[in-house]
Amino acid sequence: MADYLISGGTGYVPEDGLTAQQLFAIGDGLTYNDFLILPGFIDFISDEVDLTSALTRKITLKTPLISSPMDTVTESSMAIAMALMGGIGIIHHNCTPEFQANEVRKVKKFEQGFITDPVVMSPRHTVGDVFEAKVRHGFSGIPVTETGKMGSKLVGIVTSRDIDFLSEKDYDRPLEESMTKREDLVVAPAGVTLKEANDILQRSKKGKLPIVNDSDELVAIIARTDLKKNRDYPLASKDSRKQLLCGAAIGTREDDKYRLDLLMQAGVDVIVLDSSQGNSVFQISMINYIKQKYPELQVVGGNVVTAAQAKNLIDAGVDALRVGMGCGSICITQEVMACGRPQGTSVYKVAEYARRFGVPVIADGGIQTVGHVVKALALGASTVMMGSLLAATTEAPGEYFFSDGVRLKKYRGMGSLDAMEKNNSSQKRYFSEGDKVKVAQGVSGSVQDKGSIHKFVPYLIAGIQHGCQDIGAKSLSILRSMMYSGELKFEKRTMSAQVEGGVHGLHSYSFLPFTRNGYIEPGSRGHPRAGPNVPSPAVTKHSS
């Protein structure tokens, strides 16, 4: 047998594939479909893959997924769901500043550790006030103090059990006649740790645990519902106060400074400067303003697609960069403006430059499949921002409608005339607020129902983990290290190779990306259990 056919222990492995540097040195603009990653060696199970990654210089996520600041993608419901699953949502700004700030406030109030600014009432408030608060805030466990303010002496608490069976004729009854009195409450002393307080709350079997000082004055409160959320969502993205992380987008004009102030009052964690072309004097000026007024606030700059664009924003002090121009499914910037760059090349070029300064990169746009997420991360992105992939989920804004028997939701680009007509924030993003003739850089369309984020995101997480497993990377930091060291190998795909890599040779087929009748229980990381028959994105196709 010829020597080159003899196997076993030779130590010889021929060179195969291209490094990322070689792949992008060719000069062609590459999209995610234009290349593949060659497989590596597997010595771990997919559940062991650590998806922790940096959103900004100071904020880390356990899941590298972000929902886009689009008015058909992210408001409070989406942001809450994304944060619970370990990612983060960025509230869009195609609305009034007050509406946007209130959406951020809803996210921050959804889950908390020590609640230091709860709704508080006095004994003179009425049962009707509690019902009104329940409608406004979604809960009715309200502490009662002498003055109706924090820092005042605790005299009781009113819960749904106290008022559930009261009728409208009782709405004028003062709370001192309906509340659970102070002597019947379980409380914890000021200075108690969150773990100790949670233990007391569990033993008490109560819904709320007031925290009081030596003078019996209310200083904080914790809620049983938050305990359950901690159990069900161990990956949840939280700040130092145990509130869910939330981001918001703003523009780069003078009136956006007022919007910024309202968002800061609402507790926003990260600001995304929303511009189709981020390398501008407007954005640099806004970065300088924010860093002077709110030096600890994390700021994401963009969008950029070249190292030269990135340099100016990094020099101005951004904490992360958003990469992508004209690559979204509803974006036509490349066609209309002749400006942009294929997303694969954009991510690699900007990430390779920004990493030298410790600035994480967000791959924004062009994500059609979970494989595209893996490719973006393998090219150096720390996180991935998604629009169309999350559109038409239960948590996305808008109402479902039917067309030809298919359940759909509206999805539109922020550069569409549709979005521009709703609010001038969208116009500012494309520098067109003063134009007599508006030039659309996006389109409006519809997307098929994907079901809930709580079922769809676990599918994305599992897909990313399996992709990293096939590559041989046990974490995203290892994945990036393999790419920059040249250990990770790529290969360009011809059009024929792309056809071969997809479904082919069938008359018709059904595509169901994740389990329909089972779902991933939050925190189980890969163990399906029986669940309700919630619609999943299924596609039946026929070959022509």
From Swiss-Prot:
Q: Name one GO cellular component term.
A: nucleus
Q: Carries keyword GTP-binding?
A: no
Q: A Pfam family for this UniProt protein?
A: CBS
Positions bound to NAD(+): D274, S275, S276, G324, M325, G326
Q: Which Gene3D superfamilies match?
A: Aldolase class I (3.20.20.70)
Pathway(s) where this gene product acts: Purine metabolism; XMP biosynthesis via de novo pathway; XMP from IMP: step 1/1
Molecular function terms from GO? IMP dehydrogenase activity; metal ion binding; nucleotide binding
Could you tell me what reaction this enzyme catalyses? IMP + NAD(+) + H2O = XMP + NADH + H(+)
Q: Where in the cell is it found?
A: Cytoplasm; Nucleus
Which residues are noted in the entry as IMP-binding? S329, D364, G365, G366, G387, S388, Y411, R412, G413, M414, G415, Q441
Highest rank taxon of the organism:
Eukaryota
Q: Where is the major localization of this protein?
A: cytoplasm
The active site consists of: C331, R429
Q: Which example biological process does GO assign this protein? A: GTP biosynthetic process
Q: What cofactor does its activity depend on?
A: K(+)
EC annotation?
A: 1.1.1.205
Give the record's subunit note. Homotetramer.
Q: Which family does it belong to?
A: Belongs to the IMPDH/GMPR family.
Cross-referenced HAMAP family: IMPDH (MF_01964)
Name this protein carries in UniProt: Inosine-5'-monophosphate dehydrogenase 1a
The organism named in the record is Danio rerio (Zebrafish)
